[in-house]
Swiss-Prot record:
UniProt source species: Human cytomegalovirus (strain AD169) (HHV-5)
Superkingdom: Viruses
Entry annotated with the keyword Ubl conjugation: yes
Localization of this protein: Virion tegument; Host nucleus
InterPro entries documented for this protein: US22-like
GO CC annotation, single: viral tegument
Record protein name field: Tegument protein UL26
More about this protein: Isoform 21 kDa is first detected at 6 hours postinfection. Its expression increases at later times, when the additional 27kDa isoform is also be observed.
Assembly mode: Interacts with UL25. Interacts with ISGylation machinery components ISG15, UBA7 and HERC5; these interactions inhibit global protein ISGylation.
Gene: UL26
Annotated family: Belongs to the herpesviridae US22 family.
Task performed by this protein: Plays a role in the inhibition of host NF-kappa-B. This inhibition affects both the canonical and the non-canonical pathways. Blocks the induction of host IKK phosphorylation. May also influence the normal phosphorylation state of several tegument proteins including pp28 in virions. Also suppresses virus-induced ISGylation independent of its own ISGylation.
Length: 222
């Protein structure tokens, strides 16, 4: 099912406006609209309710044209549990991440779409698979993503990544201002950690615990 955004902006808040557009197109009922307008403590949507009600749906994004958010759990994305655990280790997530689905053109297969997750500060981050994996800030919040679509800087950051112009998202790769505060980056590489000891192929099993301990790189790029 596709959710088509209308043009009417008659509600007071962006959350209620988005809900009204969904309802206008017959996508969700009154109860669903009430859920969409209810704020979580950080001012965003209640993620648990959002995931429960929208799971399995393509939600059209206002920008760019043809892009959708397919709401699903991490099991329906290309990422493995190892990749998600290492994604959480990036400073930009502040140690918390909730995968909410995939973003991309509606006709693309799941593994060709970026994986979207909500970080501790409420921002929406996209995990991109490339020669060197990277994470890009897609929106300042989930309500903003649904209301406006991807940030216009998103594709500029993807291009910077392709040109090798990003920093790594671990603590050693961070930039700080004169007061020692971390300068927020809109995109960063996912560092591929080095093996701390030799692994003998065929004789030693590579486990999730080894990955989480920082002994092996992404499961997608061995």
């Amino acid at each position: 099912m596709y959710a088509v955004f209308g043009l009417t902006r008659s509600e007071v808040t962006p959350h209620e406006a988005a809900a009204a557009r969904y309802k206008h197109r017959g996508v969700i009922d009154r109860q669903g609209a009430a859920m969409t307008s209810r704020r979580a403590p950080d001012g965003g949507l209640n993620l648990d309710d959002f995931m429960r009600r929208q799971r399995g749906r393509h939600l059209d994004l206002p920008y760019p044209r043809g892009y959708t958010l397919f709401v699903c759990d991490v099991e329906e994305t290309i990422l493995t549990p190892r990749d998600v655990e290492y994604w959480k280790l990036l400073v930009v997530t502040q140690g918390q991440l909730r995968v909410i689905g995939t973003i991309g053109l509606a006709n693309l297969f799941s593994w060709d779409r970026s994986v979207a997750g909500v970080a501790a500060d409420g921002s929406v981050l996209c995990y991109e698979i490339s020669r060197e994996n990277f994470v890009v800030r897609a929106a300042d919040s989930l309500p903003q993503l649904l209301e406006r679509g991807l940030l216009h800087s998103y594709f500029e950051d993807v291009e910077r990544a392709a040109q090798g112009r990003l920093r790594h998202g671990n603590r050693s790769g961070l930039r700080r201002d004169a007061d020692g505060q971390v300068i927020r980056e809109s995109a960063c590489y996912v560092s591929r950690v080095l093996l701390r000891h030799r692994v003998t192929p065929g004789k030693q099993e590579i486990t999730d615990a080894m990955f989480e301990a920082g002994n092996v790189p992404s499961a997608l790029l061995p």
